[in-house]
Amino acid sequence: MTSKRFAIMEQPIVIQQVIDQVVHPHAGAINTFIGTVRELTKGKRTLYLQYEAYPSMAEKKLAQIGQEIQERWPEARVAITHRIGRLEITDVAVVIAVSTPHRADSYEASRYAIERIKEIVPIWKKEHWEDGEMWVGDQLETTSYPEGAPKMEEEE
């Protein structure tokens, strides 16, 4: 497991190690969001997911989300790790840990983080079902790539 607070990795995520990165004496709450691979999506039985990303770009966007959270909730500490590669049903795909002095901010910041991940982080998934497969171009599932994963763009 990496010690980076914002990481993309191929190996299974060790949840406690993500949490440990936000432990702080001023924290009265640590909220942890754990996103897993579910079996049914839109009525189709999922066999597994294949996540791909441009790790350096994705980690920059995760860090950007961390900065946005810091601006909105100045006392928050955030760590986010997203897994790539083949993930089976029930595997952990993403872990978000947020610590704040009070629980309400922790919940809000955690929700903000997952929504922003789905909006701006360049991670794609290929859904494999019993009757086919499809690349999903963004995690909001508004863009698909029937010809395969998107080509790498220039880094910002």
Curated annotation (Swiss-Prot):
SUPFAM superfamilies listed in its UniProt record: Molybdopterin synthase subunit MoaE (SSF54690)
Enzyme Commission code: 2.8.1.12
Protein's GO biological process: Mo-molybdopterin cofactor biosynthetic process
Keyword flag Transferase: yes
Molecular function per GO: molybdopterin synthase activity
InterPro entries named in the record: MoaE_sf, Mopterin_biosynth_MoaE
Pfam families according to UniProt: MoaE (PF02391)
Alphabetical UniProt keywords: Molybdenum cofactor biosynthesis, Transferase
Pathway note: Cofactor biosynthesis; molybdopterin biosynthesis
Disulfide bond sites: none
Residues at which substrate binds: 36-38, 46, 102-103, 118, 125-127
Organism superkingdom: Bacteria
Reaction(s) this enzyme catalyzes, per UniProt: 2 [molybdopterin-synthase sulfur-carrier protein]-C-terminal-Gly-aminoethanethioate + cyclic pyranopterin phosphate + H2O = molybdopterin + 2 [molybdopterin-synthase sulfur-carrier protein]-C-terminal Gly-Gly + 2 H(+)
PANTHER family: MOLYBDOPTERIN SYNTHASE RELATED (PTHR23404)
Assembly description: Heterotetramer of 2 MoaD subunits and 2 MoaE subunits. Also stable as homodimer. The enzyme changes between these two forms during catalysis.
Family stated for the protein in its record: Belongs to the MoaE family.
The protein's role, per its UniProt record: Converts molybdopterin precursor Z into molybdopterin. This requires the incorporation of two sulfur atoms into precursor Z to generate a dithiolene group. The sulfur is provided by MoaD.
Record protein name field: Molybdopterin synthase catalytic subunit
Organism: Halalkalibacterium halodurans (strain ATCC BAA-125 / DSM 18197 / FERM 7344 / JCM 9153 / C-125)
